[in-house]
Amino acid sequence: MDETAREPVLVDLALQGGGSHGAFTWGVLDRLIEEPWLKIEAISGTSAGAMNAALVADGWTQGGAEGARAALEAYWRRVSQAAAFSPLQRSPLDRMMGRWTLDTSPAYIAMDLMARVVSPYDLNPLGLNPLRAVLAESIDFERLARAPIRLFITATSVRTGRGRIFRNKEITADVLLASACLPTMFHAVEIDGEPFWDGGYAGNPTLTPLVRESARVTPFWCKSIRANGWSRRARQARSSIGSTRFPSTRR
């Protein structure tokens, strides 16, 4: 059957947070967008999923499906290039063994311990975040405001613990940074005088607007639902706890 002649299928996408999940989701989205019959109506995203959502919508507005694919690739390559200068690198042994983990990286272990006792306001008093420059280079927020793909980006209010959903015209670099703001690593991001943390604490991702406003579409939920497993090691145990607690999809 000629795929170009196939009847279009409207879909909503729900994209979870987590840096590595976000990179994986890039590959999933790249493959989905290749299909000419698939039409994206709306995307709900949190944290890294919020970045992917904004990239798809902005890229699509500029150049259709190929524009969305190009925007995703350009962003993740910029992130990768920026990470090349980070002190958080795999240990020589991990490189030799072909393991993609930071669990034995001295810099990562030191940062992990430091983050438990020292506030990011002390470690990084200026609140610098290299991701801000990457976002500014990757997304045209004025164009995003008029994108045909509707966006629902979640961030968590520090004061109330409730999620706030931002739509296309409200989305700025601050909104995306707020959606990905881990409180042990970054300053809370203020929006309209209100401090926000990572959206994953309230909805990872939020499904409510997709269900209420897009009744005729097929939902496509891209998130990890498999825990890391049971371990006797402290760091892996904390990771498992986070994997169990953080995917708090709000329906």
Predicted features along the sequence, with ranges:
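Gly/Ala-rich beta-loop-alpha elbow adjacent to hydrolase catalytic centers
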Residues: 45, 49
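Patatin-like phospholipase
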Residues: 1-44, 54-251
